[in-house]
């Protein structure tokens, strides 16, 4: 069997994690008779006996390069390789190749969440919800099979795209964690709040700063908040950093961490997770496995992961009180 995997957008964060999971799965399947071809952009992946890697780094130069690749190069590659199955990890199917079976992995949640972005508020997110989202929904209808990470995404896809639940299967992210140290109940750990998140507005760091400012006005400052930002990643991060410094808030910007370093923080802090747009919310599961206390946004994705967990408190992600 020949399986062709497309994921040229993936370069970092959750998208890259999904790609790496399938690559590892392909390498481990060397004795199953399945030949894999991965079509990617910039990630470095080694070829093996049953895995071939086709890299197209120029795809990342601009949206026009990506559009050209999607409309012309990708269909041509499919016809040339003649696979038994296409697996698209790009949230949309490969166009103009109807005779080939297509499995679509949908992990972009923006078109399906309740919160709607205004054009002036965030032009990119508005575009995903109102333009790219239409292509995602159309692809869900066209694909032979759909894979999502959570039950709430399955229900949302069924509702938005009007497809049968039998067409969609749920595959939670594989999380092979060797927990070396569980959360330790100490005064310092209960006063330390940790938020591992990228510098994007939907991660909702701002609500943390608002809450810290309110606590300062009440004379409460015997705690610390640790963010995995350095304050210089983009305008959003710089705005957060300058506000925290200006208001004298007990917030530390420690920069990005390796995965093992993140796990170490789970053992000595409370996870605070105010993000209101996620497909899965991986830190929630990671902290749960480390038995850490969690303060999470009151959202569908949070409840799906944490409703069976005792050490969690939910809050309204737009209310600093």
Where on the chain are the PLM-derived regions?
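Membrane-proximal helix-turn-helix segments that form the acceptor-binding/catalytic region
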Residues: 125-146
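A conserved mid-protein helix/loop that constitutes part of the nucleotide-sugar donor-binding site
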Residues: 16-24, 200-216, 235-238
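Conserved donor-binding/catalytic core segment of Leloir-type glycosyltransferases
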Residues: 186-203, 209-212, 226
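Nucleotide-activated donor-binding/catalytic signature segment of Leloir-type glycosyltransferases, i.e.
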Residues: 237-260
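Donor nucleotide-sugar binding/catalytic pocket of nucleotide-sugar-dependent glycosyltransferases
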Residues: 141-159, 163-180
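Aromatic "clamp/platform" in nucleotide-sugar-dependent glycosyltransferases that forms part
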Residues: 276
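Glycosyltransferase donor-sugar binding loop
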Residues: 41-43, 224-238, 253-255
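Conserved acidic donor-binding segment of nucleotide-sugar-dependent glycosyltransferases
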Residues: 312-320
């Amino acid at each position: 069997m020949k399986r062709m995997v497309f994921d040229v957008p993936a370069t970092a964060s959750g998208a890259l994690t999904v790609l790496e999971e399938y690559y590892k799965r392909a390498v481990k399947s060397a004795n199953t008779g399945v030949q894999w071809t991965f079509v990617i952009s910039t990630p470095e992946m080694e070829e093996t006996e049953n895995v071939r890697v086709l890299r197209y780094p120029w795809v990342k130069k601009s949206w026009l390069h990506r559009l050209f690749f999607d409309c012309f190069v990708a269909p041509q590659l499919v016809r040339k390789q003649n696979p038994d199955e296409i697996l698209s990890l790009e949230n949309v199917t490969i166009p103009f190749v109807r005779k080939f079976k297509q499995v679509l992995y949908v992990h972009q949640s923006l078109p399906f969440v309740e919160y709607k972005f205004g054009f002036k508020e965030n032009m990119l997110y508005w575009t995903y919800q109102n333009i790219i989202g239409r292509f995602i929904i159309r692809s869900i209808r066209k694909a032979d099979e759909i894979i999502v990470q959570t039950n709430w995404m399955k229900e949302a896809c069924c509702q938005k795209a009007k497809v049968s639940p039998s067409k969609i299967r749920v595959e939670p992210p594989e999380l092979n964690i060797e927990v070396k140290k569980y959360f330790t109940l100490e005064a310092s750990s209960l006063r330390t709040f940790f938020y591992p998140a990228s510098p994007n507005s939907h991660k909702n760091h701002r609500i943390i700063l608002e809450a810290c400012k309110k606590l300062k006005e009440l004379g409460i400052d015997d705690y610390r908040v640790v963010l995995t930002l350095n304050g210089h990643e983009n305008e959003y991060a710089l705005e957060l950093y300058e506000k925290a410094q200006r208001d004298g808030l007990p917030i530390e910007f420690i920069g990005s961490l390796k995965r093992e370093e993140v796990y170490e923080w789970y053992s000595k802090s409370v996870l605070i997770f105010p993000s209101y747009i996620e497909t899965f919310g991986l830190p929630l599961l990671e902290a749960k496995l480390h038995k850490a206390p969690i303060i999470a946004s009151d959202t569908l994705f949070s409840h799906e992961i944490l409703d069976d967990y005792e050490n969690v408190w939910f809050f309204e992600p737009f209310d600093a009180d």
